[in-house]
Amino acid sequence: MEEEKLTSEKEIYDITVIGGGPVGLFTAFYAGLRGISVKVIESLSELGGQPAILYPEKVIYDIPAFPAITGADLVDNLIEQLERFKDKTTICLKEEVKTFEKENAIFTITTNKGNHFSKAIIIACGNGAFAPRRLGLDDEERYADHNLFYNVHKLDQFAGKKVVICGGGDSAVDWANALDKIAESVTLVHRRDAFRAHEHSVEVLKTSHVNIMTPYVPLELKGEGDEATSLVIQKVKSEETKELSLDSLIVSFGFSTSNKNLKSWNIDYKRSSINVSPLFETSQTGVFAIGDAAEYEGKIDLIATGFGEAPTAVNQAIKYIYPERDNRVVHSTSLIK
């Protein structure tokens, strides 16, 4: 699968999937399994969504048939699975969908790079675009991506280093526990005494070698050139300060998400989720929504849930596009020889 280069040619795809995260990738695979052409439009520079960007090294335990799998491995497997249908699949990266409109049964999908054309659309963009919450300190941007990080792609890059982590949620605690095994030292800074993480993870943290600094908040970054060398922290409701020497700083304050373009998509939505029927139809005929982007009674936001929704959405889209076809579902064991 190669990234598409937009041309003036109006190539019309059967289904366009908005979102290249795990659910979007599996949707594209299942569409290929049904023998139709599919395009995936992803706003980021790589496929995989949150597991690839936010927690590639973290282990996921609730994916069927995988007792444990990292975010990166899950994404790699989904991309490998999709490779089977690379001749009928087009990937478009770094494209944000602004609007889409239907005329004569064909959707024109407008992105920041141009127009795409499709007979049906499946929205699988999760909670939308996401960006890290920052420290809000002077010189933060100067150190970002040098030795100040908002997510961890590879644990090995911190081996033998003095690491300071800011945050008190699941990610911060998980990174602290994981890095405790390979870093020279790990210091975890949180503004409250209690952590907002799973109880078991907190218990592991308390028995680790991690230096826990609570309740403290970041006050000042110090550095040389493009690298931070220390973080000054201040105790909450106190004038007391401490300066923490560091080789690497991880800011784990979570990420803010935005589905700001929903308003221009001409579909019914509530807050940042799209209202769907039991068949994952939106208020606009020919447009479907699944995964975290979709909202219905009893919805559970899990990757596994989105995987289960994908075949239904694809099959309904095919019925919409080709109502004259025999659309009985056939098992993959009969479709792939």
Curated annotation (Swiss-Prot):
Keyword Oxidoreductase in annotation: yes
Cofactor section: FAD
Pfam families the UniProt entry points to: Pyr_redox_2 (PF07992)
E.C. code: 1.18.1.2
Lineage: Bacteria, Bacillati, Bacillota, Bacilli, Lactobacillales
Binding site for FAD: E42, Q50, Y55, V97, F130, D292, T333
Assembly information from the UniProt record: Homodimer.
Reactions this protein catalyses: 2 reduced [2Fe-2S]-[ferredoxin] + NADP(+) + H(+) = 2 oxidized [2Fe-2S]-[ferredoxin] + NADPH
Protein's UniProt name: Ferredoxin--NADP reductase
Keyword Iron among UniProt keywords: no
